[in-house]
Amino acid sequence: MSKDPGRILIFDTTLRDGEQSPGASLNLEEKLAIAHQLARLGVDVIEAGFPFASPGDFKAVNKIANSVGKENGPIICGLARASKGDIKACYEAVSPAPKKRIHTFIATSDIHLKHKLKKSRKDVLQIVPEMVNYAKSLVDDIEFSCEDASRSDPDFLYEVIQLAISAGATTINIPDTVGFTTPNEFGKLISDINKNVPNIDEAVISVHGHNDLGLAVANFLEAVKNGARQLECTINGIGERAGNASLEELVMALHVRKSFFNKFFNRNSDSPTPLTAIRTEEITKTSRLVSNLTGMIVQPNKAIVGANAFAHESGIHQDGVLKNRLTYEIIDAKTVGLSDNKISLGKLSGRSAVRARLEEMGYDLSREDLNDAFARFKDLADRKREITDRDLEAIVSEQVQLPEAKFQLSLVQVSCGNASKPTATISLINTEDNSEDTAVSIGTGPVDAVCEALNKLAKVPNELIEFSVKSVTEGIDALGEVTIRIRRDNKIYSGHSADTDVVVAAANAYVNALNRLVFSEKKSSIHPQFDNLENADKTLLSNPGK
């Protein structure tokens, strides 16, 4: 039987696999904000990125290792393909963290070996022990993944795993890379690995899965029953294609059904000991932060964190909940940090009051960021009678979202009505030469006119593919959150902003998206799964930290 830590280890890959969602690219400050919140959430491992991909990715992982890595905090992990170049860059990036891990991988399915890697099984059997041993010479904590394990030949898979453990791997990850398996199949795969790998007792079994068939969470829970003790997941289930297994769904399934899962940990069914180290009251805040910063909206009926997760429309359901919450609710909303608390802050409130409330909410801002957030708070307080925690969340998340800005919005002015053509006047500052230009455009509506004017000024070709707006809180004076996604050369960039004027919010969101596009094109990066491994060592970043 595989090594058992006595509970489930939560391995969060929001900053690596989650960021590979189209349009979910994050800047350094955003990654840091999410990493700090993941630490507050209580995840065991943060996979902070793929350091070899680009100098920017290296810097982000290194910064997280420096500022989030603590003796009593999460393990900081980086991803590396099975090549010395990747592994060396990964080690250098995570080295500042007291608790660090190198996560290296290679494909084991025949379809990947033939069509992607152009390698034989014999090649893989030679590469795995060599690269795991090299990684082990740098750090003690090594995770090895058999990419596309669920479609690999079982006997070959067992052989690869045995070699990886013998070379020093302490965690063996079994990915369902394309979300292909069903729960019974995935559970059997984990069970068979336990039975057929002689040295599996020297490593923790981890699972990683995608949601292409909507089965990722179910597969993971079946894996837990069969000995998996680390779950690789993302906040809100974001990730490539249909996404990854959702952290909040997995954690709350194990929390609510603890009496069922306890027996798989040799506990009494009524044991009160938690199955994970997650602070569940931080779940909602973490979900909103990731949604705001990535621009990926959570569907209203999403389990645990969706807007309707604790809403009841049916009269029968409403009556039952009023009489006894347990009639139709299996989770207390407060357990996941959901509350309607309103704070008595207004236009007369001072910096210390705002700072104190932000600290209570878990935000630790620098002096400069606090000054900026307070200025936005005062501006909002002049226009909005009642400030809520959601308003403060919107202010702070937008504060850290701002990318490196080539463009800054100076003026937004629109005119529209049922008897006039929507017209927008926009002034935009180019920070590279500090010049300011103004353009006027007509559109099908005020937002369309704003976007047309911005495109005239920015001269950055793109296609608007999504515009969405939602209210942060209730009331006529509520903040409106706008998310805009644009596409160029098959890459998607998102922008997010909040304002009581949704047209102004739309203009700011569009400028944020344009800045992301411009910033992204200044850097090049590689994909850990799709880029050729052949030249990885030759193309090692000569000085990745700069």
From Swiss-Prot:
Q: Which branch of life, at top level? A: Bacteria
- Protein name according to UniProt: 2-isopropylmalate synthase
Which positions are annotated as binding Mn(2+)?
D17, H208, H210, N244
The annotated subunit structure for this chain is: Homodimer.
Q: What is its EC number?
A: 2.3.3.13
Q: Where is this region: Regulatory domain?
A: 408-546
Reactions this protein catalyses: 3-methyl-2-oxobutanoate + acetyl-CoA + H2O = (2S)-2-isopropylmalate + CoA + H(+)
Q: Domain (Pyruvate carboxyltransferase): give its ranges.
A: 8-271
CDD domains, from UniProt?
DRE_TIM_IPMS
Q: Name one GO biological process term.
A: L-leucine biosynthetic process
> GO terms for molecular function, please?
2-isopropylmalate synthase activity; acetyl-CoA C-acetyltransferase activity; manganese ion binding
Alphabetized Pfam families for the sequence: HCS_D2, HMGL-like, LeuA_dimer
| Main location as per UniProt | cytoplasm
| Alphabetically ordered keywords of this record | Amino-acid biosynthesis, Branched-chain amino acid biosynthesis, Cytoplasm, Leucine biosynthesis, Manganese, Metal-binding, Transferase
Report the locations given in the UniProt record: Cytoplasm
- Report the top EC class in one word: transferase
**Which function does this protein serve?**
Catalyzes the condensation of the acetyl group of acetyl-CoA with 3-methyl-2-oxobutanoate (2-ketoisovalerate) to form 3-carboxy-3-hydroxy-4-methylpentanoate (2-isopropylmalate).
Instruction: Report the pathway entry.
Output: Amino-acid biosynthesis; L-leucine biosynthesis; L-leucine from 3-methyl-2-oxobutanoate: step 1/4
Output the Gene Ontology cellular-component terms.
cytoplasm
Question: Which organism does this sequence originate in?
Answer: Prochlorococcus marinus (strain MIT 9215)
Cofactor names: Mn(2+)
Q: Which family does it belong to?
A: Belongs to the alpha-IPM synthase/homocitrate synthase family. LeuA type 1 subfamily.
